[in-house]
């Protein structure tokens, strides 16, 4: 019962965060001010931070407007999934998405990360200050 509740909360958080970062005006080109290299490098750092079990450090990477919705209860299912995948092996393929919405610019990378027991596909999105606005692992 407890795991279902946490899974549901994680799904709701992922949906809310995705709504903030994805909208009608999506394109594959990154907006001015973002580069593929900077987004990729920051995503790698944020994925490694999330994997490190440093909840407070990972939470601090999110935009201020999202801080209150990031809880240990939504973080734990991610750690559980990570434990099932085993040790990190390598960062794999990437795809980049950019968006401008209501005067704000966003960039995201879809990153396939290889682990000993499989892969996790991350969608990691950033605002103009390179603060996290989306972190989905599936």
Language-model regions: role of each:
Residues 1-22:
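Sec-dependent bacterial lipoprotein signal peptides
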Residues 18, 52, 85-88, 129:
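Alpha-helix termination/capping residues and helix-transition junctions
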Residues 22, 89-92, 133:
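A short, local hydrophobic-aromatic micro-motif
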Residues 24-48:
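Short, low-complexity N-terminal intrinsically disordered segments enriched in polar/charged residues
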Residues 45-46, 50-57:
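Short helix-adjacent coil turns
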Residues 57-106:
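Short solvent-exposed beta->alpha transition segments
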Residues 96-138:
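Exposed beta-sheet edge and beta->alpha loop/turn motif
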